From Swiss-Prot:
This is Gamma-glutamylaminecyclotransferase. It comes from the Eukaryota. Keywords: Lyase. InterPro entries: AIG2-like_dom, GGACT, GGCT-like, GGCT-like_sf. Substrate binds at residues 7-10. It catalyses: epsilon-(gamma-L-glutamyl)-L-lysine = 5-oxo-L-proline + L-lysine. Coiled coil: none annotated. The lineage of its organism: Eukaryota, Metazoa, Chordata, Craniata, Vertebrata. The gene is Ggact. Monomer. One of its GO terms (biological process) is modified amino acid catabolic process.
Length: 149
């Protein structure tokens, strides 16, 4: 089992969360909420308003999201779902626990896989950086789900 940290459309209440609940993809168990220990730019970009965590450690904000424990089957599914390694790259990062279910305490640090990208348009660096993502957020950039494209 591995920990993954999701910050965008895979979070609870977001457009793609349903794939985390589909056991045909493997197992994913919610473990808590956290934030990246290092700062990163979280931007919303492209014609479909996709959230992207740019792999630029030290720039942007500590990003909040959710921590899941996943099995190997779900990890492989998510790699495919996130078009890894072409669109996103699966990166191991330290995540500080904000709220935890079960063993563990707030303030602890957990190593998680996170889908980041090092391949992006240069103008993305000038987009607003977000601390957290909500498809319905005040940014007004509603995500366009895959099934609508």
């Amino acid at each position: 089992m591995a920990h993954i940290f999701v910050y965008g459309t895979l979070k609870r209440g977001q457009p793609n969360h349903k794939v985390m609940l589909d056991h045909s993809h493997g197992l994913a168990a919610f473990r808590g909420r956290g934030c990246t220990v290092e700062s990163f730019p979280l931007v919303i970009a492209g014609e479909h308003n996709i959230p992207w965590l740019l792999y630029l450690p030290g720039k942007g904000h500590c990003v909040t999201g959710e921590i899941y424990e996943v099995d190997e089957q779900m990890l492989r599914f998510l790699d495919d779902f996130e078009d890894c390694p072409s669109m996103y790259q699966r990166t191991a990062l330290q995540v500080q626990v904000l709220e935890w279910e079960g063993d563990g305490d707030p303030g602890d640090s957990v190593q998680c896989f996170v889908y980041t990208t090092a391949t992006y348009a240069p103008e993305w660096l000038f987009l607003p950086y977000h601390e957290s993502y909500d498809s319905e957020g005040p940014h007004g950039l509603r995500y366009n789900p895959r099934e609508n494209r």
